[in-house]
Amino acid sequence: MPPKGKKGKKGKKLPVLIDGVDTSAMTRDQLEAFALRLKAEMDREREERNYFQLERDKIRTFWEITRQQLDETRYELQQKDKEIEATQDLADIDTKHVMQQMKHLQFENHNRLGEVRAEAMTQLKLAQEHHVLQENELQRDKRQLRRMLRERMEMSEMQLRQMEAHFNEKLLEQRITFERERKDNEMLHEEKMIEQKAKLDLFYGTQMFEVEERKNQQIKDLQDHHDLAFNDMKNYYNDITLNNLALIGSMKEQLEHLRKQAERSDRIAADTAAENRRLKEPLEHANIQLNEYRRKLEFYERDKQQLSRLKTRNTRLEKKVKGLTWEAETLILRNDSLVAEREGLKERFNDVIVELQQKTGLKNVLLERKIAALMREDEKRSIVLHETIATCAPNFAEKLTSLDERVGNIIDEKNKIILDLRYEVTKARKAHDDLLETYECKLKQYGVPTDELGFKPIRNRDQQQLYVCGPAGIITENK
């Protein structure tokens, strides 16, 4: 058999790759598990695609609604701008009309002021003539009062001299009588005191001698009895104790009797001293009356000097009152003109304030609407940005959220620091103003003009204040 020829080499079979995994070497179970995993991933991808499709439709619908609202808002803003222009035109017309009325009122007020000034001058002349007549009558009354006062002063001086002479006579008589009675009483009571003291010394000496003798005799008897009964001391101990107690009781009774006698002597001495004090009281009363009369005399002299000073001051004040009367009448006329001018300026100021409030209110409403629209636009953009970042890069979305929170916290802290600094600046400004007001009050109190402070006060209130002063001048937060 001829030899068989060699067969050519077969080509090498390539591996099958699915999702980057070689499936040629897998078993049936592995392939089934791999197929189930692929199916689950495909289902998940399909769900995500449906979810993103729904989110895209929602965003598109939301964007269309927002654009429609934006168009409506722009149309409303145009209408409001037209209304504001119309209102401004009407306000300008009203302002011109009011200014014309103010000119007419000023002209009428000027004419009325001239008439009032002429009437006031006429009344002033009449009042001046009347005041001259009253002044003459008052001068006559004042001369009569001075004459009556002079007569009363002379009469009072004469009565005072008579009373002084009579009082000096009575005082001398009372002093002589009291001095004589005092000497008699002193001599009488000194004799009684010496006699009573001698009697008491003799009586107390006799009593003490008797007590001393009885005590010595008793001691001697006790010593004799003790020597005789020393051997039988235990048998007679109770009898001796009873005898000693009886002796002590009798001695206590004697001491009590002596103490009562001493108390009677003290009472007699106290009665004598009380009688001396009773006799001294009329003399002291007379001295008190003398001092009282002397003090009344001093008061009279002081009142007399005060009366002369008051007369001089009255003359000076009358002249000053005349000058002040003329100044007051001039100031009243000037005050009337200033009051009329102030009323006109006040009405004009109120009209301007109302106009400014209306304009400011319209501007605030427009700004609030613009701010609300910008905030809504910012919220929309933030939502779209977060959704886009969450879809494309979830990790970056978490970082962005934490970054937003951190930035928000930093901004809040900075805002709080700014508010605290503004509050401190406002407190310093308030303290500066209080110090300046106190300084100006002191200058006014001492008659120094406030223009001579030596520096220019800083009172800038153009900037917006976040803190204001409360009812008691306390710095409070302006919320």
From Swiss-Prot:
GO biological process, one term: flagellated sperm motility
Main location per the UniProt record: cytoplasm
GO MF term list: microtubule binding; small GTPase binding
Keywords associated with the record: Cell projection, Cilium, Coiled coil, Cytoplasm, Cytoskeleton, Flagellum, Microtubule
InterPro entries recorded: GAS8, GAS8_dom
Cytoplasm listed as a keyword: yes
Organism whose genome encodes this protein: Drosophila melanogaster
Primary role: Cytoskeletal linker which probably functions in axonemal and non-axonemal dynein regulation. May play a role in the spermatozoa motility.
Protein's name in the database: Dynein regulatory complex subunit 4
Subcellular location, record wording: Cytoplasm, Cytoskeleton; Cytoplasm, Cytoskeleton, Flagellum basal body
Coiled coil: 28-93, 117-170, 210-347
One protein family per Pfam: GAS
Family under the similarity heading: Belongs to the DRC4 family.
Domain of life: Eukaryota
Gene: Gas8
Cellular component terms per the entry's GO annotation: Golgi apparatus; microtubule; motile cilium
